[in-house]
């Protein structure tokens, strides 16, 4: 096989063609929803709204910005742990997310915000587009270091499409609750990415083994990603919840779950090391599993101690996964999972989906109040014969649909990405920025001397 | 003394036991407050609230997230300035804060949000838990590099307990104003930590002197912490202020104070260097003293120029402290204050407490308006014989109580932490990540060459 | 010429004198606006406001904090790309911004918030002060590495003054729309800075050429700045827009423009490299041009696809500028533009101004609705003979005024900064932190060994 990693024509053409197509489609289809349109001034009078604050903007803007930080800084920097792949981690994540949010506005728009003629966008669409791209960032973690930016654009194109369809099935047909996306974002993204990684299996990846580890400073950069994901996860899980108590509860639950998850991740990391030392990989990743695991139930009545339990379990399972499962997946199943997304998003996503099914099936009027139950599950819009038990079964169905879509979609996309002309690098050059980036020469002397002889002494 | 830093059983057992206890206590005691409960839907009708926006969530969520960033990224990265202690700074701060917020929800809950049967939590509890942990992060700065994570968990357990009691005395018994916590958070945290450091005095710490300095990049990581603390401090000081003008005023005052503080910190840093050069330690720390000093008065009528004066003074005092006081404390009083928390939190916290007493004692109807005065000091809830003078004296009393609690508590906790089996390192191994962390090997060649010979040239 | 870079007296005196003057002026002039004053409690009753949420604080606080992050972390870290100038980039940006916001509160206050006796400040003033300082940060980018902190303070003093006058002319006399400041902030700041750089031309700058490049990690630090600017730009462009739909629309438009800009920046960066490799300089800077270009039209009816087109064009033009224009400016016009602000803020700012003139001149009732049009352009406050065409011409006039003010002001300030006693460094010592900062010695061995021989093995 001839490896040609020179993207001089392929990458520019891909970017420009995609963007021109997006502009054309936006021109034909995308308009502002009422509360972002100047006609809102009249609408306020018609709807008898007392204040501009009733504009959706003020309910969701802070959460939106937090989610935005998670996608670009959170995921971007989390993946900078590799010693020579920092530019690509941050830069390709930036590229795929910037493309993905535009395509998601269209795909999700057609399926969910289409008024027959136009897609009407407001802040909720932007949040949902960020969410959709979040699942692509998850999948990127599985193939990190082994694909070209052109492959990433293609993967994003397909994954956003499949994500939107899967989301439509879950939210609109099965009417499941999944406000933080345990199923639609995390489980779907992880298993999609793992399937792609499986198809793209590289038998000689050990040739770039040396670059698969971190350095001292690359691990600190990665902690920037970890912490912004961890801190803003309450916003992630509450961003599109119902106004009022649901948003409030989702934030509290996620806060609790993540706190518990840190303690069990630390515990297991130390217990599984022969000298009791902590492993940065676990601290960077497993501590976040509590946010993933709470994605489905965040706005439901799990109670704070229920959230703690979920975080407790996810921290343990995720750390165990990093120690035992990732090597197993690579050696036995030929799945090379660079960032261990199976441990951070895969299993915790499934746990979240199961927790959602269980929590929904035990919902009752005592716990929620009569109006509260109707409001929480949107029953007035739904079938009359609604029951908690049925909701629970639909939740479980949603999990299976997500996994099935991820596996089938991952196979198809993986096969497309295996075509040899996307500019991928040979196995021995994986995890290396210099393949796709102009890299600065290191300064001759790395020492920054306080009394540099090249500096003229100042006059006294 | 036999030093055993292998935490393989001690750290996991401590984490898991604590977390299991927390889950049990949360299960028995913690429920959602009304505005995070599904019954809120009915409550809105009963209370005749016009909109979901009246949910406390929308008043405080942006401030909460900013405070959250300050605790985890702000304090965490501020301490990464040490050349070989970045993992521990960020990682142990992460661990103790994640444990501390859970324990604080319980302790503060029992004392302040207990309805006789349950602790009812909403967003304000989360903010207060973060605040409480902030004082532990301050104390951590004093002992940074010299304690094991097990010691930190124990210190957090006790300090959160003492903090909650002290806070209860100040806010509920003495009814002082301290919305940004000059007294409860900063002065208490600093003197508690310094007392612990005094008890844990290490006579041979000079053996790890070499690792007590920074490197070029570790200083830049620390600036991430500094800036997020600096930028979000207006949120910190306004997060639990009264709705409306008080929150608004607290943000403006803090913004002003911090801006002034930067100028005087820079001025003093340059003036105190024989060649007029700036010292990163001062820029990283003293610039923040203006936020600490404004913690008590932030929501009071100090006026913008009063805030500037406080910031002006704090910047000067704090920088002087780093240059003259820290060496004095170490050589004469045997207090080894790794991060100089005495200069950043100790003295400015006392200045803040005094400023609060003065500002309260000159409060009057001209300045606040009649309703404004009652609202600002919550007089309707308090004794009828309220007077500004009395309030001022209670404020001063609050400062003394905080200092007394810190000193007494610090001695007790210090003695407990001196027990030899918590996994602490010998003096010559302080400030070293490798004691508790798996550290990556540095790559053989640090040079990242643009034209790496190991990269196959792409086909033309 | 004798170069004396010892600032021991000059910098402290400058900082302290300026701060004392600011405190005096704040004491005489600055008070709280009504919604940050305790009399607000009564005001609510008088104005019949239903809720504390009507306090301006709740409309704008999240946007304010995002803008604050952009100024201090965004601009500060964006400039850390230089290998030996990270302390100065972050530190001097911190210093000039902290001084600038105070001076801007006064200058903008006298011109726009003066009630005859006092400047009444609220959150909007803080945002505007941050905006004003943003233009100084832009200018700083042009002279980065070549000026002393004393020069920066002087530049800030004058630039804030000129900015405020220019802003007054545009917003109050010409009544142009420029909520995100394409003209007032970006074009003004860039051409002011470039003119200063032109006057301060250093013929022997090639002597410090070696330090003008980046290192691997300095580029990652710079990406922190890039991403926080990119992510929070929707807040920047919407922060002072009208309540409701205008803020909402400005956020959506900016989000779209920035996303498109990333794709065209990547495309051009790859296409212009002989091996198709990406250049970090473009990814760090050109990706942001879409935010600059949308500054004037953000709240107008450009529609999402119009925003995409602006972002598309700005990404291309900006990347071309970095490749072709910056070398041309240096070699032919003797303008040494360290950060390439001409490409990121100059040309995109002009594009934004032109887009504003075009968009305003095609405004009509179909697009905005009758009340919407009046509200969007504030027509009720303005002359009766308002027409879109006239608005368009005033917008164009505003752009010319901004450019003229920048060039004339830049010449004057440049001449002042050329005086030889401000502590500037000789050409061969530019881009070097050690001139003004105490720099840590690099540790003897940079290797952090996992099994450090200096660490006593733990007892079994």
From Swiss-Prot, chains A, B, C:
SUPFAM superfamilies: Ammonium transporter. Keywords: Ammonia transport, Cell membrane, Glycoprotein, Membrane, Transmembrane, Transmembrane helix, Transport. Belongs to the ammonium transporter (TC 2.A.49) family. Rh subfamily. This is Ammonium transporter Rh type C. It is a multi-pass membrane protein. One of its GO terms (cellular component) is basolateral plasma membrane. Residues 1-9, 83-89, 146-151, 201-219, 273-285, 330-346, 418-460 are cytoplasmic. It is found in: Apical cell membrane. It catalyses: NH4(+)(in) = NH4(+)(out); methylamine(out) = methylamine(in); CO2(out) = CO2(in). Its main location: membrane. The lineage of its organism: Eukaryota, Metazoa, Chordata, Craniata, Vertebrata. InterPro entries: Ammonium/urea_transptr (IPR029020), NH4_transpt_AmtB-like_dom (IPR024041), RhesusRHD (IPR002229). Homotrimer. Glycans are attached at residue 48. GO terms for biological process: ammonium homeostasis; ammonium transmembrane transport; intracellular monoatomic ion homeostasis; regulation of pH; transepithelial ammonium transport.
């Amino acid at each position: 096989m001839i490896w040609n990693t020179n993207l001089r024509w392929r990458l520019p053409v891909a970017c420009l063609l995609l963007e021109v197509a997006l502009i054309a489609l936006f021109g034909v289809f995308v308009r502002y929803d009422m509360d972002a349109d100047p006609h809102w001034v009249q609408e306020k009078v018609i709807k008898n709204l007392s204040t501009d604050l009733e504009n959706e903007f003020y309910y969701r803007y802070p959460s939106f910005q937090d989610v935005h930080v998670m996608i670009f800084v959170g995921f971007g920097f989390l993946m900078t742990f590799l010693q020579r792949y920092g530019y690509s981690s941050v830069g390709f994540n930036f590229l795929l997310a910037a493309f993905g949010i535009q395509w998601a506005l269209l795909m999700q728009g057609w399926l969910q915000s289409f008024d027959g003629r136009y897609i009407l966008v407001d802040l909720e669409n932007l949040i949902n587009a960020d969410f959709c791209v979040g699942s692509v960032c998850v999948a990127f973690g599985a193939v990190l270091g082994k694909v070209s930016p052109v492959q990433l654009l293609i993967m994003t194109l397909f994954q956003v499409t499949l994500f939107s369809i899967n989301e439509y099935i879950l939210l609109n047909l099965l009417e499941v609750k999944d406000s933080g996306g345990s199923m639609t974002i995390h489980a779907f993204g992880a298993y999609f990415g793992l399937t792609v990684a499986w198809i793209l299996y590289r038998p000689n990846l050990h040739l770039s083994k040396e670059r698969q580890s971190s350095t001292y400073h690359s691990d600190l950069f990665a902690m920037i990603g970890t912490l912004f994901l961890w801190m803003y996860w309450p916003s992630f899980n509450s961003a599109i919840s119902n106004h009022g108590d649901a948003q409030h509860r989702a934030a509290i639950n996620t806060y609790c779950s993540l706190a518990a998850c840190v303690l069990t991740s630390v515990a297991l990391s130390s217990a599984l090391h022969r000298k009791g030392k902590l492993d940065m990989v676990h601290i960077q990743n497993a501590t976040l599993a509590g946010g993933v695991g709470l994605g489905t139930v965040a706005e439901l009545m799990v109670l704070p101690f229920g959230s703690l339990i979920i975080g407790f379990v996810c921290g343990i399972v995720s750390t165990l996964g990093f120690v035992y499962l990732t090597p197993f997946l690579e050696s036995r199943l030929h799945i090379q999972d660079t960032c261990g997304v199976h441990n951070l998003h895969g299993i915790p996503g499934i746990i979240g989906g199961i927790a959602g099914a269980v929590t929904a099936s035990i919902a009752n009027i005592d716990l929620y109040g009569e109006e509260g139950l109707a409001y929480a599950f949107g029953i007035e819009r739904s079938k009359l014969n609604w029951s908690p038990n049925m909701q629970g079964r639909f939740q479980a169905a949603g999990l299976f649909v997500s996994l099935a879509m991820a596996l089938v979609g991952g196979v198809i996309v993986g096969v497309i990405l295996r075509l040899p002309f996307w500019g991928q690098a040979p196995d021995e050059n994986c995890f290396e920025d210099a393949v796709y980036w102009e890299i600065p020469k290191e300064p001759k002397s790395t020492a920054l001397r306080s009394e540099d002889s090249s500096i003229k002494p100042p006059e006294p």
